Amino acid sequence: MDGDSNLQIKRRMIAVKPATPEALAPYGRILGRGSGIMPTDSGFYSGKVAITKPVKFQSDSDTCLSLATIQPRAFELEHIERHYKHTQAFIPLGGKPFIVVFGAPTAGPEPDFDQLEAFRFDGTDGFCMHIGTWHEFPFSLEADTDVIVILRNETNRNLAAKDGGEAHGDDLSKLNILQRTGAVFALQV
């Protein structure tokens, strides 16, 4: 956008859907009991420990496990990002609900903005994205929503290299949605 004050900013609404394994399949896998994957016995502890392996986390480098404490913010997308080298995961602690916006991986430099989808997680299950899945950081529905975020440290370094409201690197493309589209994308919550 060129900063012309005569431009009318468009508003595009995205309906929020329940996070189900079927609805999320194009973007990744649910982590938790809601994954639909049957647990197996660990082989120890007389059957008292069952293990479920809903996804294989992929990262070939130093990986960061961090805790994000999220506060409610306007239900408008500011950025959309993707990672090229790892499968990022969000794992809630404390059972508080949150919303995540996803876009399918694309070959080009931007997502298909007309196909973005928003999903409400109830706080009992997490999510691990496919490599290249476009997403915005979770929106909390309650104060102090704690979410474990698993991603490569290279991504953290890429995020520090902001340029014009965006960040780019070998494992990251983080785009400013308003600059790219001239529109505000808002969630129908």
Pin down the residues of each PLM region.
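Conserved metal-binding segment of the jelly-roll/cupin
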Residues: R120-W134
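A short pocket-lining beta-strand/turn micro-motif at the edge of beta-sheets
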Residues: E117, D125, A143-D146
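Non-catalytic, conserved peripheral segments adjacent to functional cores
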Residues: D2-A118, N156-V189
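A short beta-strand-loop micro-motif that forms or neighbors metal/cofactor-
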Residues: T133-A167
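His/acidic/aromatic-lined binding-pocket segments of jelly-roll/cupin-type domains
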Residues: Q88-I91, G126-F127, P138
